[in-house]
A protein has these predicted regions:
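Broad phosphate/nucleotide-binding scaffolds in NTP-utilizing and phosphate-metabolizing enzymes
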Residues: 1-257, 264, 277-288, 325-347, ...
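Catalytic-loop of the protein kinase fold
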Residues: 265-272
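Long, acidic low-complexity intrinsically disordered regions
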Residues: 289-322
Length: 469
């Protein structure tokens, strides 16, 4: 007990020291504001890797203290987390080179550094060809670091239940419901199965606008600390042409629509580093095929997945309805990577999200309120009929004030925080199942906002929704 107390106290004191030191440096003009925030992110992540996810979620909210430079830094921070040479699993990488004819540049230098893994480039040589591959390799000692991080965060998060202004943000439940997702990322066997699942959903005719990497599962079976997969080449979200954003927003909307309402799964970590934006110049043969596809009906979509659908729709979203000259010239695709966090919807949750989205689209604010109160809050028996009706009225009014304007939008991170404050005042909060989805929505929101141009991501999603709802 004494050792536990010392360990937790040491962790808190270290975090406090980092905060005080960096704040004093900023106040004494030793660094700019942007450098101050970046230094906090860097040093806190070294103290506890859960802070990486925290900073990732923070940048999904609009706040005057978050400058564009800081927001972009935090958005890309998960791909550039600090690491040391001792965390490179040299033994596994050398086995990979010796046993599977994979060339990796030495000395081993990662091209990206995530919280759990280091990413390397390589070339897989077979009898037929050479293929560029990506090697995802677990950091040495990361399992123990994750367990230590969970141990320390468990105590820190417990305090959020009693701190004013924080206790009603549902931080405790969001953390508890998502920490298992972090632990699951330690098992590359789980991630390989997730990649294969999404690959099977998107490697069918008519769905090639989404590129999922092919994974070499047999390698992970023999070397469990590595994943070898096809390399996807594309631009980052910060390097795409502004005029192309609407195209990509449309593709992302189709990806999420099909995943949620047809496949009953969702990618739990759609941050800017996990999406590649591909723009290919069409060949004559491709152009003629795609021109024909423009007039295709829904029969070209992934109808085989409809048997797994949990909603009443029986047609997948059409993927080629764009007819301007630029579309005729180029093929647009999204490359989706990193399937360490994948969630599955229950039938009830899938239907709830469908009706919630439909209520927001139709601006039926009573439906929105009933969806939230009847299906997304707990404990179920905490509300009397009188209190329930009162709360439904308040949420309906909130929906009218925030979603009743001409522009359409869905619940974002700030809405969830505000609504949860209202719920907390009535002795209820968002359900644990919804908490699993809540953080994923917040993280993906950063990508959606960055794709806003002439239209928004939500506008694109609503266009698809109106066609198939």
């Amino acid at each position: 007990m004494l050792n536990t107390f010392k360990k937790v106290t040491a962790s808190y004191l270290s975090a406090a020291y980092i905060l005080i030191r960096e704040t004093m440096r900023y106040k004494c003009n030793y660094c700019t504001y942007n450098e101050y925030i970046k230094n906090l992110a860097l040093n806190f992540s070294r103290e506890n890797i859960f802070f990486i996810k925290f900073f990732q979620a923070v940048c999904t909210t609009s706040h005057p203290l978050l400058t564009d430079d800081v927001s972009q830094y935090l958005n890309t921070f998960t791909d550039n987390a600090p690491y040391t040479d001792s965390e490179i699993d040299v033994e596994s990488l050398e086995r990979l080179m010796q046993e599977y004819s994979i060339e990796i540049k030495t000395p081993f230098v990662p091209i990206k550094s995530g919280a759990i893994s280091l990413i390397f480039e390589g070339t897989l040589t077979s009898e037929k060809e050479k293929e560029s591959v990506i090697i995802k390799c677990k950091r040495v000692g990361i399992d123990d670091k994750i367990q230590d991080a969970i141990f320390n965060m468990n105590h820190l998060i417990s305090f959020t239940k009693i701190v004013p202004h924080i206790k009603n943000l549902n931080v405790h439940d969001i953390y508890n419901e998502n920490k298992q997702s972090i632990v699951d990322q330690l098992s590359f066997h789980i991630e390989v199965r997730n990649i294969e699942l999404f690959y099977s959903k998107w490697s069918k005719p008519g769905l090639d606008y989404i590129k999922i990497p092919k994974v070499y599962s047999e390698i992970t079976q023999q070397i469990p600390n590595v994943i070898v997969m096809e390399r996807i080449v594309g631009n980052t979200i910060y390097n795409i042409d502004p005029e192309d954003k609407d195209r990509y927003a449309n593709l992302l909307a189709k990806f999420n629509f099909k995943s949620v309402f047809y496949d009953s799964v969702y990618h739990g970590d759609i941050h800017p580093g996990n999406v590649f934006f591909i723009k290919e110049l069409k060949t004559k043969s491709h152009a003629s095929i795609d021109d024909d596809d423009d007039s295709n009906d829904d029969s070209n979509d992934d109808s085989s997945d409809n048997n797994d659908s949990n909603n009443s729709n029986d047609t997948n979203p059409d993927m080629n309805n764009n007819n301007n000259n630029d579309f005729k010239k180029y093929r647009y695709k999204l490359g989706i990577i990193d399937f360490g966090i994948v969630g599955k919807f229950s039938r009830e949750m899938q239907n709830t999200i469908f009706h919630l989205f439909k209520g927001l689209y139709e601006k039926n604010h009573d439906v929105v309120a009933h969806c939230i109160i009847d299906n997304l809050v707990e404990p179920k028996d905490a509300l009397t009929n009188e209190k329930k009706n009162e709360l439904i009225g308040i949420i309906s009014k909130y929906s009218e004030n925030h979603f009743g304007k001409e522009t359409h939008r869905f619940l974002d991170a700030e809405d969830i925080i505000k609504i949860n404050k209202i719920l907390y005042g009535f002795g209820v909060q968002f359900s644990k199942e919804f908490c699993k989805i809540e953080l994923s929505f917040a993280i993906s929101d950063s990508v959606c906002k960055l794709l806003t141009n002439k239209t928004t991501y939500i506008d694109q999603l609503l266009t698809i929704f109106s066609k198939y709802s």
